């Protein structure tokens, strides 16, 4: 709904956000270390209470992951790659950190469902650094903007 309302030029999502961004059909998308299979990856999604990495507008400091939440993600994950058209394949790119030990199957799943030449490997880990943003993400954003 938000994308339909705002009509963004491009969507960039990392980790879990990359999995969500992949499903936002009709928009140019860059997925960075996308966590396509969170519900079965114990490093990404396990029950318990956690602290947010960054501040939130609502002031919340923690969040809880329950078994119901994990089941919800599992159902969504099983549907996420359905009905991807050839046009959609042109709109989606995947950036994969060579030293990412959190999400290790993103490249294989992306290549299975999208275009292999839309995968870019970079020297980095799971979480983005300022260096990776400047040297990898922003140049791809500019390159894709120039294609408009």
Language model features: what each stretch is:
Residues 7-10, 91-93:
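Short active-site oxyanion
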Residues 24-25:
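Aromatic pocket-lining residues of Rossmann-like dinucleotide-binding sites
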Residues 9-12, 28-30:
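Residue in the alpha/beta-hydrolase core beta-strand immediately N-terminal to the catalytic nucleophile
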